C-alpha cells in the first residue's frame, strides 16, 4: 500500500518476494484461463489482446469478413428486425423429487444448423455452413486426441477444443444479433423452433415410457426415470434409447444422475449427487450477494430438505438464531458483512441522490467517509465491506452502517434484530416446499413451548403435465 516505498528502502527482498508471488499467481491463472484465447488468436484475424477483450459475435464476424475480402466479394448489410422464437424452458414439478437423470441434446443448435441446412440469406458464398462444419470437425478431432493424451498435452488439447466450442456456439447468436452483418432472424427462429420441437419429442418419449419430466432448459431435460430403470447402466441405456429416436445428426447425451433434486422455479434448483455433493443452479436460493452466514444457512437447509430431515431443519434454524443472539460468528465479521462494488463515482452518486433518482446507500456513504479520512480519491470499482450496527429507533440503514474492519469481537455492536430478520428472510425461501404455511412456521420458529414434533409436517410437491405436445415435428 502506501508504505511500499519505505519497505523497498528498508527490506527490498520482501518486495521482490511479493512481486514474484504476483508473477507466479498470474502465470498459474493464465495457464487455466488463457489457453482458449491463445488458440482463438491463431484462428481469428485479431491479436491476442483483442481476442481476449472482444465477444464471440465480433470473432465470428471477423472470420466472415476475412473470407469475403479474400474472395474479393462485397459484404452484405445487417438485416433489420428481431428474433421471435427462443429456447424452450419450463418447469413441471416443484419440490423434492428423485432420482434424477439429466439428458441433453449434444450441441443442440450447431447440430440443427448443420443437419437442417441453416445459413443466412445474405451469405452468397455459403461461408456460414462451411466454417461451422470445419470448426465442428476440428473440435471432434481434438476431443478424440484428448482421450489418449498425457496431462500436459491433454490440457493443451482441451484449450483448443474449448476455443472451437466458443466459436461454434456463437453461430446461432450471430443469426439473431441485430448488428451482425450476416444475421437472419427467420433462420434464427427456424433453429429455435426445431430445437423446441426436438425437446418436446424427448419429453413425449420420456412420459410415454412412464418417466416424469421435472424441467426442460433450452437443450436438456431433467427427469425422474420410468419404473424399472434403476442404476447407472439402466439410466444410460434409457438415454441412448432416446437418442436412437432422434433424427439423423441429433444425439441425446447422458449428462448426469442425481439422487435428489430440489426444484424451486424455472432455472433454479439444487441437485444432490450420489457422493453427497450439492450443486445449485440459479440465484433464487443462494446468491453471492447475500451475507456469508445466509449462504451457509441456505446450503445446509437445502441439504437437510433434500434428505427430508424435518427435525434437522428445525435444529439448524434454532442453532443459527442462538449464534446470532450470542454474537457467535464462526468467521467473525466476514460471516455477516456485505461487500459492494462502487459502480459510479461519488460525484455521480451525490447528483443522483439530489435529483431523487436513488436513495442514499451505505457503501457510497462509507466510501465518501473513507475518502475524507484518507485524503485519497475513491474510484469506481472499489469494494466496500460493511455491516449494520445497533442504532436508535428510526435510523436509516446507511446511518447504521459501519465499515467491516471497525467491528470488535470483544465488544460486538452489530444489530441483532436486523440479522435475526435476515435469517427469517433466508428461511422464507423454503416456504413453498411445505404443505401448509402452518407446517413451515412450525419448522422455522423458536416457539417450542410443547416441544417440536416433526410428525405430521408434510413437504409439498406440485406437478403439472407438460403442455399438450404436437404430434407433428419437423423431421
Positions of predicted regions on the chain:
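Conserved catalytic alpha/beta cores of large enzymes that bind or transform nucleotide phosphates
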Residues: 124-164
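A residue-level signal for conserved active-site and pocket-lining positions in enzyme catalytic cores
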Residues: 22, 26, 139, 168, ...
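C-terminal, non-catalytic extensions of nucleic-acid polymerases
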Residues: 233-475
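Common nucleic-acid-contacting/processivity interface regions adjacent to the catalytic cores
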Residues: 6-107, 111-114, 154-197, 201-205, ...
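Catalytic palm subdomain of template-directed nucleic-acid polymerases
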Residues: 221-236
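Generic non-transmembrane alpha-helical segments
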Residues: 198-209, 237-245
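Short beta-strand
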Residues: 212-217, 254
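Cytochrome P450 catalytic domain signature, combining two hallmark sequence patches
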Residues: 117-126, 236
